[in-house]
């Protein structure tokens, strides 16, 4: 069994959310959109009858991570339309910047545009039935085919990268470090 003391690291916390905002985001799609657009969250997505979701819950519990403190857990069955919205958020964060637009678009600008319906995004590669722990602040536009979501919490082996600040912020930084060695 892994020693829990190994995970007493600096956590990425959701310090700006009130209790009311957390409750609203779990039950209302509009409130969830607002919270995602305004913050740099870690979101834990849960789907029904999902063994990997239970594994993710066990992983967070073993490390003392708390829903509403360290991440926001969303049950897609409790918010009408949230599954489609979350697909679009992840796809928007991992899609290449469309031709003719500024290359260094801020992630919140891109997500805001998706929320307002100003951009269309192909979400065919996003697996909504797969549970996620993903860190919106760490996702970038540098990779394609959802590599970022794989890297930052899409799989149980990567949860730690999503939840703790001390890990490298993106794969490109890791590659720079390796190239310089």
Protein language model features and the residues they cover:
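Short, Lys/Arg-enriched N-terminal segments with co-localized hydrophobic residues
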Residues: 1-13
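N-terminal leader/targeting and pre-domain segments
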Residues: 14-38, 162-181
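Local sequence-structure signature of Cys/Sec-based thiol-disulfide redox active-site neighborhoods
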Residues: 27-67
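Thiol-based oxidoreductase modules, predominantly thioredoxin-like and allied folds used
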Residues: 44-45, 68-107
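Extended low-polarity, hydrophobic cluster-rich segments
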Residues: 52, 72-74, 160-164
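Structural micro-motif
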Residues: 90-139
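Non-catalytic, surface beta->alpha helical segment in thiol-disulfide oxidoreductase systems
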Residues: 124-178
